[in-house]
Amino acid sequence: MGVQLRLNPCSSSSAATSPSTFHNGTPYFCKKFNFLPFRTQPLNWVSGIYSRIQPRKHFEVFSSNGFPLNAVSVQDVQVPLTELGSGDTTVSITVIGASGDLAKKKILPALFALFYEDCLPENFVVFGYSRTKLSDEELRNMISTTLTCRIDKRENCDAKMEHFLERCFYHSGQYNSEDDFAELDYKLKEKEGCRVSNRLFYLSIPPNIFVDVVRCASLKASSTSGWTRVIVEKPFGRDLESSSELTRSLKKYLTEEQIFRIDHYLGKELVENLSVLRFSNLVFEPLWSRNYIRNVQFIFSEDFGTEGRGGYFDHYGIIRDIMQNHLLQILALFAMETPVSLDAEDIRNEKVKVLRSMRPLQLEDVVLGQYKGHSNGAKSYPAYTDDPTVPNGSITPTFSAAALFIDNARWDGVPFLMKAGKALHTKRAEIRVQFRHVPGNLYKRNFGTDMDKATNELVLRLQPDEAIYLKINNKVPGLGMRLDRSDLNLLYKAKYRGEIPDAYERLLLDAIEGERRLFIRSDELDAAWALFTPLLKELEEKKIAPELYPYGSRGPVGAHYLAAKHNVRWGDLSGDD
């Protein structure tokens, strides 16, 4: 592949000058260029993150087909770092689809939270981009209603909010227009001045326009002096074929290192704490295998239905929406072997090994459900098919339970049960680890015939009210020998006073810093889809009808039979939580 080198136009070192200006006369090239000596031997390169936001100077590299391979792809391979102050670099964050709900409710508030905590670099700007016609002031008014300061830190809240909004701008354009992205590039350069510019694009848009946006941004609005990164929201296709095609299309314009596939569940506090709990506590790591763990449950439930999102949801269903990504990613993180280090690639390598070791899903190990209408006194709840955006007679599941198995030495024979559903009796997301019975239990007379009541259980509650608790057996005070099941409880809001950052805050900061540990690599994505695609095709070809369950119930009865088939009792239905 032939390459051409373009010198950084915003260098401060002497050697050459340039009179280049914007068409309004504003200079966008500094007067001087940087010339670095040619070396035939490799230098001592510095990779990763030198500090929270390490400024960089380097060349821009183009492939022989004319597409830019600048940014992370060069930065992370062999890019010499120079001693620049924080004032010499800037980060420009462009939210594509800024008028949508995700941008207004999650992305922009998360950016403000990072700014409030002084986690963003000194020089940054935020641009909203969408087809909606808005002015800068209209964007600021729109997002100001969704910005909040930390509950536990309200100092200078109004002033901080005002300063953040002053850095927010808007550009209206079509998603497939190179000219519109060239205009965005012009506006970005005006704000960036002569600093080394790093650019982050967040694609908060439907997946069918990902490639158009990436093409236009890569060709017309990528950085010529710093890195360029793109955050891609799920869904990443509907099956293995469409996902692979999306990846191939994106890689025409980006390298794998520039693509940050986000799964916001991996940014949740308790998911991050999972590895800490296991690998830094001797009491848990020796137990983390088939020898002591009887089953593991990954549970996601919502107490509301699709409520206006039925048109989108009906195209994907609960398996694609929750199980194939959120729950499967957590399963891989839970079950992986000890990585060589905490480096992103080492962790993701181990996750891929887990996914590739999983047994193909069987139809008899899957239960489907769909919520139906239900009346509770004076209040009535609609059925899924009552949603006007849902096609008549839809058999798209709003609930699913599945039993999965990992065919390796550590987990052979241990059922990993997933359960996800809408319009259930409670809102909950948790991991439940049920341990084996005590061999020859001396106190089995006290438990009667149901020895499941005597098993220990470790629970990591992701939402709501983050908590970790361990269920143990203990003696009730008194003269007799009466046993009771108790919880050793770590409730986060009671232990830690500070407000827990939102998952989007952590993931946005990681993307800015170039930390990929919580983002999904392309081979991870392929392995996840390879597991679920045959099942999804079989369900669609056979038109398997879901079992109906009342809105606000505990789900279809079939889920209980599935658990019983594998000698498991759902932990969230035991009634003692």
Curated annotation (Swiss-Prot):
Comp. bias intervals (Low complexity): 11-20
Keyword list, A-Z: Carbohydrate metabolism, Chloroplast, Disulfide bond, Glucose metabolism, NADP, Oxidoreductase, Plastid, Transit peptide
Residues holding NADP(+) 2: 419, 428, 432, 461, 469-471, 554
Tissue-level expression: Green tissues, leaves and chloroplasts.
Residues that bind D-glucose 6-phosphate: 234, 264-268, 302, 321, 422, 427, 463
EC number: 1.1.1.49
Residues annotated to bind NADP(+) 1: 97-104, 131, 234
Disulfide bonding pattern of the chain: 149-157
Annotated Gene Ontology cellular component terms: chloroplast
Principal cellular location given in the protein's record: plastid
Enzyme class: oxidoreductase
Region (Disordered) location: 1-20
Outcome, altering residue 157 to S: Abolishes redox regulation
Subcellular location: Plastid, Chloroplast
Catalytic activity annotation: D-glucose 6-phosphate + NADP(+) = 6-phospho-D-glucono-1,5-lactone + NADPH + H(+)
Active site: 326 (proton acceptor)
Modulation of this protein's activity: Regulated by metabolites. Post-translationally inactivated by cysteine-mediated redox modification via the ferredoxin-thioredoxin system in the light and this avoids futile cycles with photosynthetic CO2 fixation.
Pathway info: Carbohydrate degradation; pentose phosphate pathway; D-ribulose 5-phosphate from D-glucose 6-phosphate (oxidative stage): step 1/3
A GO BP annotation: glucose metabolic process
Transit peptide: 1-63
Entry function: Catalyzes the rate-limiting step of the oxidative pentose-phosphate pathway, which represents a route for the dissimilation of carbohydrates besides glycolysis. The main function of this enzyme is to provide reducing power (NADPH) and pentose phosphates for fatty acid and nucleic acid synthesis which are involved in membrane synthesis and cell division.
Subunit structure: Homodimer.
Protein name per Swiss-Prot or TrEMBL: Glucose-6-phosphate 1-dehydrogenase, chloroplastic
Naturally occurring in which organism (per UniProt): Solanum tuberosum
